Design a protein with these regions (language model features):
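Flexible, low-complexity segments enriched for small/polar residues
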Residues: 2-3, 8-22, 50, 54, ...
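Hydrophobic/aromatic residues in well-formed alpha-helices
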Residues: 7, 23, 32-33, 241, ...
C-alpha cells in the first residue's frame, strides 16, 4: 500500500473521507494524523438557531408558522375553531393548568410544568411538530459539521460515542446537552466523559435513575453503565448491580434540566462493589469500575471494531488497552496510537468497513464538496437507511457492520447518488416507529421524495485530474473515491456512462456512476 492509499484510508477512518484538496496537499499519513489531532483539539459545542424547543405555558398554537413568528398575546392558546378577524387578536381559550407536583420519571416534554395528558389533540400535534423540528435541526446541523468541519477526528469520535452512549429522549434540550457533553470530552479523558454523560438528565431519564431511591432501588442505570458503557457482560455480578444501584440512589435532575443530587433519596449505608467495601457514592462506583483491567479491554475493543475492523485482533487490542489504562484513559492518546500502528494499514483492514448511513451521506458531501439547498430529504434518507441521529434503536445503539445492508437499503444506497445529483424519482414510505420522537405522522409526512438540491462543484475534481486524458479519468477518480480496486467490468460500465457527453457532463456522469457502485459502500 503506497502513501496515497494510506492517506485516504486514514481520512476515511479518522473522519468522513478526503477532499480533493486534502489529496493535493501531499501530506504523509503521519503528518496528516498530526494535523487531524491538531484540528480536533478544540471543543466547539453544537449551537445554532432552531436546535431547541421550548413551549412555555400558553404558547402552544395550531399553525406551525405562527409559533415561529407570532407569539400569542397574554399567554393564551388559540385553536382553529376560534378564528380571529383580520387584524384582531386571536380569541383565547383557557390557559393550561400547571402541573400540581413533580413526581419524577420524566423531564417536562417541551412544556415546563404542564401535564402532557391535559393537552388537546391540536396542542399535542403542535408540540410534536415543534419537538420534531428541533431534532431535525439538530441532525442537519451535526451533519453539516461532519461534512465541512476541519475537526474531522472529533466529529468521528462524537459519532462513535453517540452510539456507545446511546440515548433516546423526547426533549431536544436534554438531548443536545448530552450531545455537547460527549462532544466536549470526545478526545479527553474517559473518566471525565463517563461522569459527564452519567450525570446528564437525558441519560438519567432514559435509564430510569430518576426513580432510583433508597426505599425502592432501580437497577437499570447501574446495569447498563457496566454492561454497555464500561465493562461488558461477564465482568460483574448481580450483587454488583444491586450494590451499584444503591450507590446511584439520589442521582436525578431538576426542572431546569440540571443534574441534582437528592441527598434524602440516597442510600448512605455501606456497600460492597467489585470487591471494594465502604459508603460508596455514584462517583465512587464509576471511579472503581475504571480500576478494572476489563474496562480498558472492553472500551478498546469497541473502538477497534468501529475504527479498524469488525473482527477484533487480541494481539492489537491487548497492548492498546494496557497503554490506554496507563495513560489515565486518554482518548486522544489511544486514537493516535491506533492510527499510527503499522497494522492499521494492513490490507485486511482497508476497504472492509461498511459505511453507516451517516458516514455514507456525510462522506459524499465532504469528498465532493457538495452543497445542499434542502436538507429535509436527507433526514428521510437517514431513516430509510436505518440510522437517524438522536434516535438510536435502543440502549445498545446501532449494531453496525453487515446489519446496515439488506435488499431494500442496498437498493437505496446504490440509487442515492442519482437521487441527489440527477433528482431521480424515488419515494419511500417510512415505517411508523412506536418510539418515534414525534409519533403519529401521516403516510404523506413519512414519505421521502427527491429535492435536496445537491450541487456538485467540478473545479476541485478537475484540478485533481489535471492533464489526465478523458479515457483514463474514470480509473483515476476510482482511486480517489474507492477504497478497493475497481473491477474491470465495473470500470467499463463507468466509462460507458461518460461516453458521448461534453467534458463537464461526462465528469458528472462518471462521478455518479462511481458513487453508485457496491465498492463505494466500503471504507
Amino acid at each position: 500500500m503506497n502513501s496515497a492509499q494510506q492517506l485516504q484510508h486514514l481520512y476515511w477512518r479518522a473522519g468522513f473521507g478526503p477532499r480533493p484538496q486534502d489529496v493535493a496537499a501531499g501530506l504523509s499519513p503521519r503528518k496528516a494524523l498530526r494535523q487531524l489531532l491538531h484540528d480536533s483539539a478544540r471543543y466547539e459545542p453544537l449551537v445554532g438557531p432552531g436546535l431547541n424547543y421550548t413551549d412555555p405555558q400558553g404558547t402552544v398554537m395550531t399553525d406551525p408558522a405562527s409559533t415561529k413568528t407570532n407569539p400569542v398575546p397574554n399567554g393564551m392558546v388559540t385553536t382553529p375553531d376560534q378564528p380571529a378577524p383580520p387584524g384582531a387578536p386571536a380569541a383565547p381559550v383557557a390557559p393550561l393548568r400547571p402541573r400540581a407536583a413533580f413526581k419524577g420519571g420524566t423531564i417536562a416534554a417541551g412544556v415546563p410544568r404542564l401535564r402532557r395528558a391535559e393537552l388537546t389533540p391540536q396542542q399535542r400535534k403542535m408540540q410534536n411538530e415543534g419537538i420534531r423540528d428541533a431534532f431535525n435541526n439538530m441532525s442537519t446541523a451535526w451533519m453539516d459539521r461532519m461534512a465541512t468541519s476541519s475537526a474531522q477526528l472529533r466529529e468521528k469520535m462524537v459519532l462513535f460515542w453517540h452510539g456507545h452512549f446511546a440515548c433516546r429522549v423526547r426533549q431536544p434540550a436534554a438531548a443536545l446537552s448530552l450531545h455537547n457533553a460527549m462532544r466536549q470530552h470526545a478526545l479527553g479523558k474517559f473518566p471525565d466523559l463517563l461522569l459527564a454523560v452519567s450525570q446528564e438528565p437525558a441519560m438519567l431519564q432514559f435509564l430510569n435513575n430518576q426513580q432510583n431511591r433508597k426505599e425502592h432501588p432501580n437497577e437499570n442505570f447501574a446495569r447498563e453503565v457496566m454492561e454497555l458503557f464500561t465493562l461488558g457482560r461477564g465482568n460483574y455480578t448481580e450483587t454488583d448491580v444491586k450494590e451499584a444501584a444503591r450507590a446511584f440512589t439520589g442521582w436525578g435532575y431538576d426542572y431546569q434540566g440540571r443534574f441534582k443530587f437528592r441527598e434524602k433519596e440516597h442510600d448512605a449505608g455501606p456497600k460492597t462493589f467489585l470487591g471494594k467495601t465502604g459508603n460508596l457514592t455514584g462517583e465512587d462506583v464509576l471511579t472503581h469500575i475504571l480500576t478494572q483491567p476489563a474496562a480498558a479491554t472492553f472500551l478498546v475493543t469497541k473502538v477497534y471494531r468501529f475504527f479498524v475492523n469488525d473482527v477484533p485482533n487480541p494481539a492489537h487490542i491487548e497492548p492498546l488497552a494496557r497503554d490506554f489504562r496507563r495513560s489515565g484513559y486518554d482518548i486522544a492518546d489511544l486514537m493516535e496510537r491506533l492510527f499510527s500502528a503499522d497494522w492499521f494499514y494492513e490490507p485486511a483492514n482497508v476497504g472492509t468497513h461498511i459505511k453507516s448511513p451517516v458516514e455514507l451521506l456525510a462522506g459524499i458531501r465532504r469528498t465532493l464538496n457538495v452543497k445542499i439547498d434542502n436538507e429535509q430529504p436527507l433526514l428521510g434518507y437517514q431513516r430509510a437507511l436505518g440510522q437517524t441521529l438522536f434516535q438510536p434503536p435502543n440502549v445498545a445503539g446501532w449494531p453496525g457492520g453487515r446489519n446496515w445492508i439488506d435488499s431494500s437499503s442496498l437498493l437505496l444506497r446504490l440509487q442515492l447518488p442519482a437521487i441527489l445529483f440527477k433528482n431521480a424519482e424515488f419515494a419511500v414510505a417510512l415505517k411508523q416507529d412506536e418510539n418515534d420522537i414525534a409519533p403519529n405522522l401521516t403516510k404523506a409526512e413519512r414519505t421521502v421524495r427527491p429535492g435536496a438540491g445537491a450541487h456538485l462543484p467540478l473545479a476541485p475534481l478537475q484540478q485533481l485530474l489535471g492533464a489526465t486524458p478523458v479515457p483514463q479519468q474514470p480509473e483515476k477518480l476510482s482511486q480517489f473515491l474507492l477504497q478497493t480496486p475497481i473491477r474491470p467490468e465495473n470500470l467499463q460500465l463507468v466509462q460507458q456512462a461518460a461516453q458521448q457527453k461534453e467534458p463537464a457532463e461526462a465528469l458528472r456522469a462518471t462521478l455518479v456512476s462511481l458513487l453508485s457502485l457496491p465498492e463505494y459502500q466500503l471504507a
